[in-house]
Amino acid sequence: MDRRNEDTALLALRGGLRGRFRRSFDSMENAFEVLQDRLQHAVNPAERAELMPLLEELQTQLICLRRLGDQASDAATAALLHGTCVPQPIDLLGQLREFCSILQEEAAQYALPFTVTLQADGLDVLPTTGDVSLLNGLLTNLVSNTLAADRAAHIMLLCTPGRLCYRDNGPGLPPDAAALLTEGQWSERLLHAGGLGLPLLAAYTSAMGWALTVGEGPGMSLQFTLPAAPPLDGMVLTSPTERLADRQNRRRLIRRELAVLVADTSMQ
């Protein structure tokens, strides 16, 4: 199988897995809505008030399961991504500007108090190679991890030629989490806690041909060393339809992460 067919097969696998998960979740959500409607009309106000916390918890878990399904489908193909993903020339700075803009717009809908700053002193563009879908996964996972620790966090994206730094003012990564990111070593604590966020961060980074190191605190500091910048004339211009689809997908991912965050917090 040639490289193009391999890429197509991987995308089909990932899409098929996501579709299968989502059909199951859609069925669960439909059943939940029927249950909610029945309770709305078949019980008295006192019983309804007693059952509402349970319904809210079920709704939260459905949101989390949908997110986990997307992550699991990514994880199922992550081991193959490094050998088959072909990073394309991109303007990383332009991608980051759009990501931050959408993130701020969506955060305003939930009245979340965190801030995000993009610094790229003296740069108009930051040419490198990467993959827009994988970049979306990388950034949304990073933001999700930060906000899970502190909803009022300050996130900083610092761009210099050949390098991207992600920082926040949170508690920072524990040593075993840093070892998982950079060396793939699972500790007993992390195995018990579960989750796919950290290994997916490493997989996205590796698949794009980027290098990841964990910097010193305070807060979390991740340094991404970027591949050599391609010539600007090597940039592939996407059609307006493709750009719109990319933007919509980016917004969907950000909205999902923030919805999970708000739902988790409301149940605490």
Task: Describe each PLM feature range.
Residues 57-68:
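Short alpha-helical segment of the dimerization/phosphotransfer core of two-component systems
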Residues 106-118:
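Short conserved segments within the C-terminal catalytic ATPase subdomain
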Residues 80-85, 125-130:
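Conserved micro-motifs of the catalytic ATP-binding
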